Amino acid sequence: MRNALLSIMILVSLIVGASTLTRGHEWGDDFAWYIVQAKSILSGTTDEFMEQSAFTNQESTTHLGPLAYPWGYPLLLAPVYAVKGMSPLALKLPGLLFYAGFLVCFYLLMRDRLPQIESLLIVAIFAFNPLLLQFLDQILSDVPFLFFSTLSLLLMTRAGKRSLLHYIGIGAAIFFTAFMRVTGILLLGCLLIVEFFRLLANRSDRGTVLEIVKGSATVCFVFIVLWITNLLLFPSGGESYFSQYAELIETARAAIPAYFNVFSYFFGNTQAWKYLYYLVFIFFLLGAWNHAKQEPIFILFFVLWIIVHITYPYFQGPRYIFPLLPIFIYFALQGMKFLIARLPEQYHPSGQAAVYGFWILIAGVFLVQSSLTAYANLQNNRGINGPFDPYSTEVYNYIKEETPPKSVVVFFKPRVMVMMTEHPTIMSMECDRIRKGDYLVLSRKVGENQQIPPEEIDACNLPLDQVLKNNRFVVYQIQE
């Protein structure tokens, strides 16, 4: 019966999530680079991609991102692109499937720690969560990363005697987590730190010491072999991440409040949800304190993840804390149970009922909100938005059909332009830098967002010849 409930929840989550997917995409252009990397895998042009990426990054006004994202997610997109081409809807399907996989892993992770009814309840919170289900409309690596990080935690924290195959599984799971996002390597660090202290605590037990050493060595060996294979198959561009950690202290000082508050978006955007989050946060602290000895890997991963991200200069909103949300909600529930256990015994049943009622209500509200969003999307015929709308397509077609193949385009989202036209593209917020291009495309809707607005471009005194204009864009040829 309980497994049937889990299956029903996951099925409902898949239906609602699939109904939330649109035929367009938001204007952020990280997604474009994942798709371009996937295309380069299929065409065998990964080295040419790296050259193109270096040009876009080096010639633009500011840093746009790493030269290449980890190749795991582009590898997942490649077969979809091979079959469906540039179809945003199809390219979102891997995220949907990996989200279902995450829910299964999360249930198994909780089943070892909570009564089955609580495991199902906590999974329901995630299965119907509006933030996460709406995020499935993004072509980004965060959801596959969430799956692999949760799978890694599941394997790393499994109780009982571990076989060689189990350690191989841990090493592979951690590798695939890092293959999605470099920060997945924190899981390997967490495992080794916890195993080191376990070794110290059992140093007089030769059998346990040998088990720890052999197990840790196996995990590291599997990870290293897979990582070397990755380096041999794909060019590396991740080192450009580290150049962004320049002013750690100032970055952290500004980011700490942002990362504290961003957890509230798991519940909702309104002030009422934020106040509810503050209450849940107290229970989270209580649960983390009470279970620190039982869950050292959870605690260590949470702390290291926060440290790494508060020192990273680019705040990306809730998606950067997705891997921590299962730990956060788990500890919050444990904090509530800890408080109930301290009440007089006659209040235990009513206290437990209150906790269950609270989470059931939250799950119900989440399901209603997500269902309404999905229904509105279907009523809108899965609207085509952002860089895939007709006005944008008109610009891409002009660039592809009416300009020389190697002409340089200046555009506020250069990686999108590269994806759609294969033209070398840069971003410029300076008049002089615009001269590096052959064509200038300005958005009429975004103001000073990584561009000089159309209404201010005349002040640059550039030799511009307008060649196309529609409701969203104006295109200029830059004269010699």
What is each PLM-predicted segment?
Residues 178, 197, 210-286, 363-373:
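Membrane-lumen/periplasm interface segments of specific transmembrane helices
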Residues 355-415:
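Membrane-embedded, lumen/periplasm-facing catalytic core of multi-pass transferases
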Residues 2, 6-11, 172, 216-224, ...:
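Signature aromatic-anchored transmembrane alpha helix within multi-pass, membrane-resident enzymes
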Residues 13, 119-130, 134, 154, ...:
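Short helix- or helix-capping micro-motifs
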Residues 3, 158-163, 187-221:
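Perimembrane helix-loop-helix junctions
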Residues 28, 131, 137-144, 317:
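Short acidic/glycine- and proline-prone juxtamembrane loop motifs at membrane-interface regions
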Residues 103-104, 202, 264-295, 299, ...:
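Hydrophobic, aromatic-rich transmembrane alpha-helices
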Residues 111-116, 152-167, 201, 290-292:
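Membrane-interface transmembrane helices that cradle and orient dolichyl/undecaprenyl
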